[in-house]
A protein has these predicted regions:
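General beta-strand structural signal in soluble alpha/beta enzymes
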Residues: 92-93, 113-118, 149-152, 176-180, ...
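Walker A (P-loop) phosphate-binding motif
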Residues: 79-109
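N-terminal phosphate/diphosphate-binding loop that engages ATP/GTP or pyrophosphate donors
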Residues: 106-153
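Short hydrophobic targeting helices and cationic amphipathic motifs
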Residues: 15-18, 29, 35-38, 55
Length: 295
C-alpha cells in the first residue's frame, strides 16, 4: 500500500478503476485510495471500462478480458513507464498539459534530463535554467543537477529554442524532452502547416489532449478551430465530441502516443469513446490526470 501510495503522487485522482481482480489487488487499491484521500483529496472510484487493461503495482498487466492498445493510469505505474520513454529526443505536442507532463517526466526518469522547447515555454520553478552555447557547460550542469532547463530568453519571460542544436544536446543528456507546440492555453488544438516544430532525430512524439474540451463548443475549446472544422467535417456551431477529437488526431497523424489528460473532468464512458475511436488506427492512448503536487 505504501508503494502504491508513493506511486500515486502524480497519478489520476478520478481514474482509479476497480475491475475484476483478486482480493489482494483490491485491498491494495482500496488502501492506496484511503491513504491518498486522507492526505490530499477525495478519490473517485469507478469501474474499469470493458476491454481496457490495468497496470498493477507490480507493473504487470492483469485482466480476464481482452486487452487493447489503451492504458488507464491508476497510480501504480509511472507515467514515463506508461509512455515507454526511450533515451534521446522526445517531442511533446498538443494541448492541455504539455508543460506539466515535461516536469513529471523529468522527475520520474532516471538519468540526466534536459527540458527545452522548439517554440516557446516558461522556465520551470525549481529547475536550474541554463543559457549557453557551450556544450561542456551543459554536461557540467547535468552532472551537478541531473535535470536542467535550456532555452533562449525572449519576451514576457518566456524561453525560445536553445542556441545549441537538439542533436548536440542529445549527446549530452540521456533524455531531451522538447515542448514542440503552442496552444493558447486551450484544451484542444488543430495544427497549422508549420506546426508542430518537431526536432530532427526525434525518437518519440507524444500528443497531449485536454479532456476538459469535450462537450464544449468547438470555437471555444479548440485552438485553430477553422482547421478542426476542415479536418473533421464538424459544423461550425458544433461541440467537441470524443469521436471528433480522435478524428482530428487521426487526420494529422503527428504522434506515436496520445495522452488524454484532465480525465477527471469526464466520465469513464467518454474516455472510452475517445480511446476506442483511436485504437483502430494504431494509436496507444494513456488516460490520466497530470496532477503535479510536488514542487
Amino acid at each position: 500500500v505504501a508503494q502504491a501510495t508513493l506511486s500515486c503522487r502524480y497519478a489520476a485522482i478520478h481514474l482509479v478503476y476497480l475491475g475484476i481482480y483478486t482480493r489482494e489487488e483490491k485491498m491494495c487499491l482500496q488502501g492506496a485510495v484511503f491513504l491518498r484521500n486522507s492526505i490530499e483529496s477525495v478519490v473517485s472510484i469507478e469501474r474499469l471500462p470493458e476491454n481496457v487493461s490495468f497496470s498493477t503495482a507490480s507493473g504487470g498487466m492483469r485482466s480476464s478480458r481482452p486487452t487493447v492498445n489503451t492504458v488507464v493510469l491508476g497510480g501504480f505505474m509511472k507515467i514515463c513507464e506508461q509512455l515507454h520513454m526511450i533515451k534521446g529526443i522526445t517531442a511533446v505536442i498538443g494541448s492541455g498539459g504539455k508543460t506539466t507532463l515535461l516536469r513529471i517526466l523529468a522527475e520520474e526518469l532516471s538519468g540526466t534530463v534536459l527540458l527545452t522547447t522548439s517554440t516557446h515555454i516558461l522556465p520551470f520553478a525549481g529547475i536550474p535554467l541554463l543559457v549557453t552555447d557551450d556544450i561542456e557547460q551543459v554536461r557540467r550542469a547535468l552532472a551537478l543537477h541531473r535535470v536542467i532547463c535550456m532555452g533562449t530568453p525572449a519576451a514576457e519571460g518566456k524561453l525560445t529554442a536553445p542556441a545549441l542544436p537538439f542533436s548536440v544536446l542529445a549527446d549530452a543528456a540521456d533524455y531531451v524532452i522538447v515542448e514542440a507546440d503552442g496552444s493558447k492555453r486551450l484544451p484542444l488544438k488543430a495544427h497549422a502547416s508549420h506546426e508542430p516544430v518537431i526536432p530532427e532525430n526525434t525518437r518519440k512524439t507524444v500528443c497531449v489532449v485536454g479532456a476538459s474540451g469535450f462537450g464544449k463548443p468547438i470555437k471555444q475549446a479548440v485552438h485553430r478551430p477553422e482547421l478542426f472544422y476542415a479536418r473533421t467535417g464538424a459544423h461550425m456551431s458544433g461541440i467537441v465530441t470524443p469521436e471528433l477529437a480522435a478524428q482530428g488526431i487521426i487526420a494529422e497523424h503527428l504522434a506515436d502516443i496520445v495522452v488524454l489528460n484532465q480525465a477527471e473532468t469526464v466520465s469513464p464512458e467518454i474516455a472510452k469513446r475517445f480511446t476506442e475511436a483511436l485504437k483502430s488506427s494504431g494509436f496507444t492512448v494513456v488516460c490520466t490526470t497530470l496532477n503535479h503536487t510536488l514542487e
